[in-house]
Amino acid sequence: MSSGGRGGKRRGAPPPGPSGAAAKRAHPGGTPQPPPPAATAAAPVAEEEDMMDEDVFLDETILAEDEEALLLLDRDEALASRLSRWRRPALPADLASGCSRNVAFQQLEIDYVIGESHKVLLPNSSGPAAILRIFGVTREGHSVCCQVHGFEPYFYISCPMGMGPDDISRFHQTLEGRMKDSNRNSNVPRFVKRIELVQKQTIMHYQPQQSQPFLKIVVALPTMVASCRGILERGITIEGLGSKSFLTYESNILFALRFMIDCNIVGGNWIEVPAGKYMKAARIMSYCQLELDCLYSDLVSHAAEGEHSKMAPFRILSFDIECAGRKGHFPEPTHDPVIQIANLVTLQGEGQPFVRNVMTLKSCSPIVGVDVMSFDTERDVLLAWRDFIREVDPDIIIGYNICKFDLPYLIERAEVLKIVEFPILGRIRNSRVRVRDTTFSSRQYGMRESKDVAVEGRVQFDLLQAMQRDYKLSSYSLNSVSAHFLGEQKEDVHHSIISDLQNGNSETRRRLAVYCLKDAYLPQRLLDKLMYIYNYVEMARVTGVPISFLLSRGQSIKVLSQLLRKAKQKNLVIPNIKGQASGQDTFEGATVLEARAGFYEKPIATLDFASLYPSIMMAYNLCYCTLVPPEDARKLNLPPESVNKTPSGETFVKPDVQKGILPEILEELLAARKRAKADLKEAKDPFERAVLDGRQLALKISANSVYGFTGATVGQLPCLEISSSVTSYGRQMIEHTKKLVEDKFTTLGGYEHNAEVIYGDTDSVMVQFGVSTVEDAMKLGREAADYISGTFIKPIKLEFEKIYFPYLLISKKRYAGLYWTNPEKFDKMDTKGIETVRRDNCLLVKNLVTECLHKILVDRDVPGAVQYVKNTISDLLMNRVDLSLLVITKGLTKTGEDYAVKAAHVELAERMRKRDAATAPTVGDRVPYVIIKAAKGAKAYERSEDPIYVLDNNIPIDPQYYLENQISKPLLRIFEPILKNASRELLHGSHTRAVSISTPSNSGIMKFAKKQLTCLGCKAVISGSNQTLCFHCKGREAELYCKTVGNVSELEMLFGRLWTQCQECQGSLHQDVLCTSRDCPIFYRRRKAQKDMAEARVQLQRWDF
C-alpha cells in the first residue's frame, strides 16, 4: 500500500527485519501441531549474533491432499487460462521423464525441514531426519527444488585426558539418557546418533603441538545441538571422571550454514547433480518444475568463475497493494479491504518487465500496456493473486516495505475473510506462509522491529530494508528515495483519499491503479539502478552465506562463515565463547590528530593508508591462532625474533612460526579484489561488468569487516587483544607518518617550504606542503607516499589519493573542500560532517549551506558568501522566504501518550486530529510543520503548526526561531575559521533590523475583528460597499486596473506552471492533481500560488465598470 509518501506503508517506521531465513524456524521439536493459516508468534529478539535452529516438521504446514483437491475445483477456468500465459518455459523431455542428464542450477535459497528418512537413499536409517531443500533456477529458466538427504547435525567438545573407547561408549549412554529426559515429547529413536574421536586443534591461541583429541557428537535433529550443548555446558557426570562441564565447539552454527560449509557451497553459486546420482521425487512436494532427491555427498558445487559466475534468469516480482481505509484511520487488516494489487515481473538482466498487471476490486478502465483484471469480491482478488504467484513462480519477491506491511497485511486479511487456501504462496505444495513478529538487534543497525514472513523457496527483498541498511538518507519514503537515486518523484495520494477514488467509478479506480503500478515499478527501477541483485549475489558468494542472510542478519555472520571455511581446511575448530571477551573490556580507539581549523587557500595533499586495518592484521600476523597469552609466553619461551610485540602489549607469533587464519582470509579477499578490478578494466559486456563491480565491492566490504568482528564484545568470537593491537598499530602509523613528513619535507632538506600536517583521521593525513599549484602538491604527495611506504612492513602502504584545494577545516571529522585527482579540473565538492541534509533541518538550511560552500570554495568569493547569508537572513525576517523552505518533517512512530517528552510534531498531530480526524497524520506518517509566532516563552512544541493551515490563515512564522535554532550553528561552523567575528558579522547588523509580520486572517483576536475595505491604490480605509479607490486615487483607474490584471495574470501563469509540473509527475495532463506529498517543495508553492491567485481575483472583481 502506498499512500501519502508511502503513508499507507507506515513511512518512517522501523525497517523490516529478518525475512525467510535459510534455516527455517517455527517449533523446537516435539509433537507437531498445525498452526492457523497465518499464525503470528511472539516477538523474539533476533540479535545478529544469536544463531539458533528451530525445526519445522513437514506435516505441520501441509493441507490434506483431499482438502487441496476440493479447493482447486472452484478455480475460475477463464482466469486460469489467462494466468497460464506467464508460466515458465516447459521442461525438455529428457529432464521431464528421466534422470539421464546432469542438472545444474544457480541456488537462491537453502532451508531444511524435518521428514522421514529416505528409504532408498538411506536404507539403514529410520525415523525423523533433517532434509535440506535447495531452491534454484537452471540456465534455461526452469525452477528446481533439490531435496538433500544424509547430512547430520554435529558439534565438538574437547576429549578429557585418558578417555578410551569404552569410556566414550559409557559417555554416549549417559548423554543419550540426559537427552531423553530433556526431549520427552520427541519420537526420535536415538538422540545422540554417535560420538567419534577425532584429532583437531582449537583456533584460540598459538599451540606448538599439531593436534589434540576432540569428540565429534552427532545428533538426530538440528535443534538437538542446542539442547545437547546446554547439558554439556551445565555439567554432566561421567563414570570414572566425575562431574564435568565442557566448552563446546561449533555448536552455534545454523544447520543450513553448516551444510554449505561442509559441502563447499556458497550463497548464489551454481550446483550440479550428476546424472544417475539423483531420483525423481516419489511424492511431489513442491510447485517447482523439477523436484529431485539426492545424497549430500553427490552434490557438485562450482566456484563462481567463468561460465559459473553468470546469473540464471531469475524471475523478479515487484508488487504493491492498495487498501481502502476508514475515514480518520490508517488501514487495518481486521477492517479494511485490499482493493488493488499491482504486479510487475522482470527477468534478471532484462530492462523491461514481461508481465504488467493490476488486480482491482470492481471495474477499472483500461490502461495501455497493462493487463487489468477486475473482480467483484475481495476474496476473488486475493485468490487471483495467489494463483498468479503460483503460475508465474517468482524466485525473488520485491517491493517497498513488503515485509512489514504488504505481505503481513495480505495474510492477516485472508485470515479475517477465512480464505484458508490463500497463504499458500511459497514453493512447497499446500504449505502455508508463516508470519511472526521479530526484533533485530545489531550495533551497526540498532534495534528494529519487523515481521518475519516465511515464503518457502522465494527470496523476499524489501527495498526499504536494503535502503536503511546500505544508505544514510534524510528520508526513506519511496518518493524521497526515488528522487535521490532516480531523479524522479511520484504522485503521493494520502490514504484518506484512496477510499473516495475506490468508491467513485471505473475512471477513478483507473487513476488509483496507475498510482499503484508506479509504486510497484519504482522498487524494480531502484533494484536495477543500484545493481542490488548483482551486489548481493556477489556478497553471498564472497562470504559464503545464503542471500537471505544478507538482509536478515548483521555483519558478524559473514565473517564467521569465512572463518569456519578456512578453519575446516586447517583442521581447526572454533569455540563457542560468545560474549566472553578475553583481556580488557575496552580498548583505545583510532587516532585523530588535532585539527588545525582554518580556511586553507593552498593545496592540501591527502595521504591515505590502503585498507589500513586489514593491512596491519596481515603485516603483523594478528589472529586468534597466533596470539600468545602472557601465561603461555613464559612456558613456551619463544625467542624475541619469533614474535611481534604490539604497541598495546600483546604478543603474536610471526608468520614463519605459524601463519594466522585471519591474515590468510584477508590476503585472499584483497588478492581476489585486485583480480576483479583488473578484469573489470578489461570487461566489455555490461552484465559481466556489473558482476565484477559487485564482486570487488563485496570483497572490499568483507575485508574491512574482519577487524570489527574481533572487536564485537557480544559477537561470535570476540578477541579484544586483536582489535586493540590493530588500533594501537594504526595510531603509531599515523603519528609516524606525521613525524616523517614534517622531518623530511623542510627548507633544510632542500624543499621550497616546510610541510605541515594539519589533520589526521583514522587512516589518512592531510598535508600542506606550502606550494601554490595542485600539480606541485600532487608531485610532493606521491613522493611522500612512496618514501613513507618504504618504512612500513608489507603490505602496509601509504597512497597519495587526492588534493583538497581550497580546503575548509572546521574541526575533527568536519571539513569541506574541492576534491582534485587531476590537476586540470576539480572532480567535485566534498564535504564531511556538515549538516546539509539532516532530518531536523529545514530545506532553507541545506540550500544556504550548499550555496555558501559553493561561493567560498568554487567561486573563491568569501565576501559574496557573507552577503548571500545576510540577504537570506533579511529575506527570512521580512517574510520573503518560500514557506516550503521552512518546513521541518519528522516521523510519527507512536501515539502522543507513548512519548516520554512533548515533541513539536506529536503535539501538532494531536491538534490536527481534533480539527479533522480524517486527514490528520497517523502513526507511521511523516508530520511536516513550521514554527509560528506565539506568546513570549512558549515552548517549540506549542508553536508547531501545519504548513497548509499557516498558508490558508496567513499565520506569521517565527523567523527568530529559524535564525537561532536552524541557521546559526551550521553557518557559524563554516564561517568561524574564515571570519574573525562571524557571529557579529552574520547574525547581527542592519540586515537583521527590519522585520515583517503578516496579519492572521482567521485566528486569535482576528476572529472578532470587523473587516473593512481598503483602497486598491494606497490601502487607505474606504467607506461604502462598492468603492474600489479612495478620493485621492481617483484618476489613476487605468494604471491601477492594469496593475491588478497583470498581477492576476502573473499568478495564473505561476499556478499553471506548478500545476502542469505536478500533472507531469503524476503521469497525466488531463486529470486533477491529488498529490499531497509534503516532502515536495512544489506542493507548498502550488498551494500558496493557488491562494494568492484566488485573492488577486477577488481584488480584480472589485473593479466594477
UniProtKB/Swiss-Prot annotation:
Molecular functions per Gene Ontology: 3'-5'-DNA exonuclease activity; 4 iron, 4 sulfur cluster binding; DNA binding; DNA-directed DNA polymerase activity; nucleotide binding; zinc ion binding
Region (Disordered) residue spans: 1-46
Biological process per Gene Ontology, one example term: nucleotide-excision repair, DNA gap filling
Disulfide bonds: none
Keyword Lipid metabolism part of the UniProt annotation: no
SUPFAM superfamilies with a match to the protein in the record: DNA/RNA polymerases (SSF56672), Ribonuclease H-like (SSF53098)
Residues engaged in binding [4Fe-4S] cluster: C1062, C1065, C1075, C1080
Signal peptide: none
Keyword Nucleus among UniProt keywords: yes
Bound cofactor: record note: Binds 1 [4Fe-4S] cluster.
Reactions this protein catalyses: DNA(n) + a 2'-deoxyribonucleoside 5'-triphosphate = DNA(n+1) + diphosphate
Enzyme Commission code(s) on record: 2.7.7.7
GO CC terms, sorted: delta DNA polymerase complex
One Pfam family hit: DNA_pol_B
Residues annotated to bind Zn(2+): C1015, C1018, C1030, C1033
Location(s) in or outside the cell: Nucleus
Domain notes: The CysB motif binds 1 4Fe-4S cluster and is required for the formation of polymerase complexes.
Other noteworthy facts: In eukaryotes there are five DNA polymerases: alpha, beta, gamma, delta, and epsilon which are responsible for different reactions of DNA synthesis.
Subunit structure: Heterodimer with subunits of 125 kDa and 50 kDa. The 125 kDa subunit contains the polymerase active site and most likely the active site for the 3'-5' exonuclease activity.
PANTHER family tied to this protein: DNA POLYMERASE CATALYTIC SUBUNIT, DNA POLYMERASE DELTA CATALYTIC SUBUNIT
Function text: This polymerase possesses two enzymatic activities: DNA synthesis (polymerase) and an exonucleolytic activity that degrades single-stranded DNA in the 3'- to 5'-direction.
Family per record: Belongs to the DNA polymerase type-B family.
Name of the protein described by the UniProt record: DNA polymerase delta catalytic subunit
Organism annotation: Oryza sativa subsp. japonica (Rice)
Gene from which this protein is expressed: POLD1
